[in-house]
Amino acid sequence: MREIRSILAGFGGQGILFAGKVIASAGLVEDRELSWLPSYGPEMRGGTASCSVTLSDEPIGSPLVMDPNALIVMNQPSYDKFIDTVAPGGIVIADSTLVLNMKERADITVVALPATEMAEKEGLKGLANIVLVGKLWALTNFCARESLDAAIDHVVPAKKQAMVALNKKALELGIQA
């Protein structure tokens, strides 16, 4: 899947926007066309957060993603809100630790991955978002693997460099899941 039109959604504080930045930065590393559009609910932490990320080899007409071919959701309200927007043939990756009721659609692939539980079990609390990005990469190969590592190097702030290795471990956990 060379072009990815994705929506990532969950509660504020789950790292949705960070995960979107990792995907967008991977496209930047590869000098591809990209857009990253964040959306916040009225509250930050605990409110709703989502972002649209598009990576393409062609010019992108709009940063808005209305019919994603990839959806990552980290809570039930986000699943319920976005499931019907996924384009036929698209992929949904849901954190099944927190998304318990998954509506079925015959025209898309839905992957239930207990990312929060997996991350906590591996000592990676708070990195379920990156576990889900790893799973998305494993299913779509939306960029070169090295580009994801470079993106993490770029996106993790200098004052939190100790988090680089943990994010890469979470990414690998998702890839192997």
Model feature map: region roles:
Residues M1-A177:
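Active-site cofactor/cluster-binding pocket
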